[in-house]
Amino acid sequence: MEKKEKKAAVEKKKTAESKSSGITPKDVTVCKATEQMLDKAKRDGVETAFDRAANMKACPIGADSACCKHCSMGPCRLNAKDPYAKVGVCGATIDTIQARNFARMVASGAAAHTDHGMGMLDVFREVVHGKIKDYKIKDTVKLEQVAQSVGIETQDRSVEDIAKDLYEELERTYTQVEGEVPFVSRVPEKTLETWRKLGIVPRGAMREIMEIMHRTHIGVDQHYENITKQCSRTALSDGWGGSMVATEISDILFGTPTPVQADVNMGCLKEDYVNVIVHGHEPNMFESMLASVNDPALIEAAKEAGAKGINLTGMCCSGAEVLSRHGVPHAGNFMSTEAVLITGAVDAMAVDVQCIKQGLASVAKCYNSYLFTTNPRCHIEGAEHIELVEHEPKKCTDEVVVKAIARFKNRTAQVEIPNISNAGIHGFS
């Protein structure tokens, strides 16, 4: 019991320090809506990322990347102020250590985009072979353009045949171990010549990520220039591989965006509607959610619960995508995701992968809002998991909406929505 009391006292002290840190919401954001919600959070006693940043001193060794923990002989701590005074137990210099640390960051970032692109390509394959009925190829012009850019014949051929060939060609982006990724055909000639001269043309995304991780292991690559060279190759496998595949397949499946007028900021939330937010990175979940919120049966259920209807908004990456593609209002970016929950108006937030703070779970709990994870790659402690199965995606998104309606009916949080929305023209592609 004594330990619990001490822990509670420490937490109380931390909260007090946070409130008296002297940093105001105006100091940390230029977004007036976020500023208003951070003020509300202070009144409500709710901690956000901004509070933690203000009260957490950054690790000075980590800031200089002067620590290596890649093997069991360490961790080894070097002095960035006198970088060459000593080396790690294995003899690694600070140049090697910093290059290795940076390389692993590159590998992680490239893996995130590559895995996302590979996931989109998997969905494309299942659609092309008729195994997923909820999605279909919406932009056949884009399909032909992309196919032609990688040398696939399109004249007098069916959409299905072109799509099957395109899938097989783009799959090489990930699985190939020699040669060059397909979209290298788009690289300007002089640029490609330079890449080839430097030996940094990506062979395949998985090959480059695997190799860079191998090189950063103890006893492998121990020259910062050579490690950095592989960083470039891995980064290019992302930009001209995983990311580009994800972009093109998304447009082919769900339609290439065209200019559309839509509102952004938290003013797009509506107090008298069931508010559902989708946040993450993968457009397929959002496309299914669009079908769910427009389902007449679910709209009627929302009205029976006392709402005027269902209001869908997006946040962050996938939110920006459907903002451009469908004109769905966008409530904010990564740093606004906690703030939007503080409005008390969010009945459910459904997330998939990337840019999702673990802190959302505790903020959602404070305002009796639902936070749902939907992807097997991303579970969050404190959030409810409803898995989206690609062959029946609406089953997941329908359940999210049903639970959002139930939360609307039993709202307990005080609602405060910033009266701020900004009109804009989006969808340039």
Feature annotation, model-predicted:
Residues 2-429:
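Metallocofactor- and cofactor-centric catalytic cores in central/energy metabolism, strongly enriched
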